[in-house]
Each structure stands twice: as C-alpha cells, then as structure tokens.
Amino acid sequence: MKIETLLSKFDIKGINYGPSTGGGNPLLSAEEQLAVVGLCWHESPVGWLLLFVEGLRDVNALKQLQIATMGEALRLMEDWRGVYPEKAIKALCATAIAEATQQQGQICPECNGSAVVVDKNRNRCKCQCCKQGRIEWTQETRFAYFARVLPVTYSRFKRYYSVQNLLVSWLVENRTMAVMAMDEQIQRESHRQIA
C-alpha cells in the first residue's frame, strides 16, 4: 500500500505548495500525516477498518472488520428467540458491511455504473435497472445480498432485517466517528503550526 494512496483516500489536508511555504515545501510530510491518522485510530478502530475497506479494498482490514462485526451481531442477537445457523451471522455481517461501504448503492451490473446501456440495435438508452449507475439499497436488494450467503425465504429474512439495520447503523456511526476524530486532529495540528 502506498502512503500517497492512503492519504488521498482520506482527503487529509496538509500539503500546501503555495509561495508562502517556500515554493514546493509541504506543511506536513506524508509521515506526519500518517501520524495524524495513527493518533485517531483509538477513537473508532471499527470506523477506520470500514474506511480502509471502503477506500482501499484492503483484504486484511476486511477480515478484521468481519470479526468485529460478527461480535457485534452476536451481541445484538443475545436475546434472539429461536435458533439460527452460524451462516446467518456471516450473511448479516456481509450484507451490513456491503451496505455501509456502498452507501449510495451497489454499482449496477447491467451498465457497470454508467447509467447507459446499448441495445441490440446499438442505440444508447438509459439503464432501466438503476438510478445514475447505482442500485439503491432497499429491503429487496438487502435480501438478495443476504441470500447469497444464506439462502432463506423472504419471510425468514424479515426476522433478521431488524438486526441487519442495527449493524449497518453501528458501522456507519463508527465510520463517522473515525472521520470526525481525524478532522479534529487535523485542526489541532494546523492550529499548532500556526501558533
């Protein structure tokens, strides 16, 4: 993983190439910017893992995020009435992570996100399956994603749906906390440099 890639994905402001800084000298080096990220990790490790999965498609972060999400799912299902297979927890986690990392919806498989398809006469027309290249998250699309891991009936999925919504909101909350912690740390660092 390149440092520049990581920093660009999180939109860390700190490199200023203006004439007031001596031409091409940055205010914060890449190492200093990574230190800012490191200082914020303790605020919301799950949020950071989610950001790594969302922005960098990091496989190691995905594995750790799945473990953390499974723990949260098990906690949420402690007083669940009835039985459920272990695959249900995995399906809940996979669906929740997918929704939390793709909040605008999944990329449409028919138009590959372009929102335009070519028909058999080579005419370009608007894709009927999506809105602006994304398939929005609805209860049906969540069910389809859930059924990839655990094929169940729709009525059975509706029992898992409440837990799945709680998992998504937990993941999005952690992501927001990580971003806010990073912003606060960057503001503190910039105030220190000004003073």
Task: Write out the residue ranges for each language-model feature.
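Feature marking protein-protein/ligand interface regions
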Residues: 2, 23, 102, 174, ...
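N-terminal alpha-helical interaction blocks
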Residues: 1-94
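Short, flexible, mixed-charge glycine/proline-rich loop motifs
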Residues: 93-107, 115-122
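Cys/His-rich microdomains that often coordinate metals
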Residues: 115, 131-136
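Short cysteine-rich clusters marking metal-coordination/redox-active sites
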Residues: 108-111, 127-130
